[in-house]
Amino acid sequence: MNKANLLYTDTNMKTFLFSEVSVGISANSMLFIVHICILLGENRPKPINLYIAFLSLTQLMLLITMGLIVADMFMSQGIWDSITCQSLIYLHRLLRGLTLCATCLLNVLWTITLSPRSSCLTKFKHKSPHHISGAFLFFCALYMSFSSHLFLSIIATPNLTSEDFMYVTQSCSLLSMSYSRTSMFSTAIAIREAFLISLFALCSGYMVALLWRHKKQAWDLHSTNVSSKSSPEQRATRTIMLLMSFFVVLYVLENAVFHSRMKFKDGSMLYCVQIIVSHSYATVSPFVLICTEKRMIKFWGSMFGRIVNI
């Protein structure tokens, strides 16, 4: 991407980027605070609350680092040194990977938790939190190793124009790598994401089947004049399906924008669009969780009630 194009990107795009960061940080902060309060207030906290709190914290840190990077894209005068560039971009890449991993593993835990007693997944209910924690630590180590090449390929932007590097922000540039190294890292990332997305798809298919089963039971109950009010499990299943669908749509859209950007060396507008799309899930998903969980609505209702009374 050309530096001049980066500097003169549409003002509306800058505003949208900063707005997304601000809204996402606020939403994830709210989600994190609520689940920390739930964890501290329960004698036997549920693992699902711990994982949601961790996911919201990961997304919060991701959006904060993204905000710093976006600020350096549009507002800085290129004051970061190589160590700052390497550290921030490495942390951002690591947090993006951990967000993907945490989202997929959270959906696995949700699927196991909501599975009926007759399901073959029942035997994993008590063991799943430990197994998922181990899987997350494994992926964490894997992501750290996958992103380690950034310490060699990210440099402070030099005061010259060259085809050997690509501008990331005003302060930071990415050195071009050899074809073999690029292929190796691309293949490793593709395998990692294919595995997690496949896991995501399996959970989605299972949840669709589970939701259909609930609906069929509701129809049978309705035909016998028994209340067919949605159960907490059904509401949770719909929430998970909504988040899964949104995640998959954004993932496909992000890859489409990325491949389009690769065809245009100076596609600064596409670069901004990719940033917006790739962080949309971290911004929107907390609102879905906040608005669909009754405990969270009651929590914020009581908090605002206390503020008004004061």
Curated annotation (Swiss-Prot):
Gene: Vmn1r41
Keywords for this protein: Cell membrane, Disulfide bond, G-protein coupled receptor, Glycoprotein, Membrane, Pheromone response, Receptor, Transducer, Transmembrane, Transmembrane helix
GO BP of this protein: response to pheromone; sensory perception of chemical stimulus
The protein's name: Vomeronasal type-1 receptor 41
Extracellular side: 1-20, 71-93, 156-190, 260-269
Keyword Transmembrane found: yes
Glycan attachment points: N159
Keyword Membrane: yes
Organism the protein comes from: Mus musculus
